Amino acid sequence: MRDADNDLGLIGLEDEELARLLAQQDAAEGLTDGDAVPKLQETPISVLGDLWLLGEHRLLCGDATVRADVERLIAGEAIDLILTDLPHNVDYEGYTEDRLKIRGDRMTAEQFQQFLREAFGSYRRIAKPGASMYACHSSPWQRQFQDAMESAGFEVRCQIIRAKNTFAWGFGRYKFRHEPIFYAHVGGQKDPWYGDKSQSTLWHEKKPAANRIADPLFQPVLIH
């Protein structure tokens, strides 16, 4: 945080909370890269329905379109910020030895529209007034994403482009070397802004090595 040469007072945190976060940053770094993921085990440790408590954080192995799952995760709290990376419905297959696929990434147009409506509807029910949302999506289904977001009550403000250091292999005439991300907020409310005036709609973030991870379209930690 200190190295960013920003006015930390703009973050909006109390002095005590800010001091705690800075102390954590000053602690010794971990032994692994931030994007490193352990090799998958044949018998998974976590199964559907598991809720992990990680300090102040809660991580649920569940379904964002299932209302009961979402309500269990938030435990009665309302959400200030949502970052979502739903299936893009592009039937992507990884180009590693395992030829990894993404579950739910091949639906009919009708199925996908219903899926998006259910997901963004769940997000809206738990969002605070004015809550912000970043929604990763695919260019071919951009209109459907925006329609579902607006139908759920979100207002799309702009589109951010994440520029990758490598492109995704495929048979298209042009290889995708970027990913679009909608920035939106709950409509009818002013969205709180904690950044400065120099933020750009073009993000340059290094793409993790595909052969190290289980999700072929994995997002780097810095995006989160």
What do these predicted regions represent?
Residues M1-H224:
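Core catalytic lobe of class I
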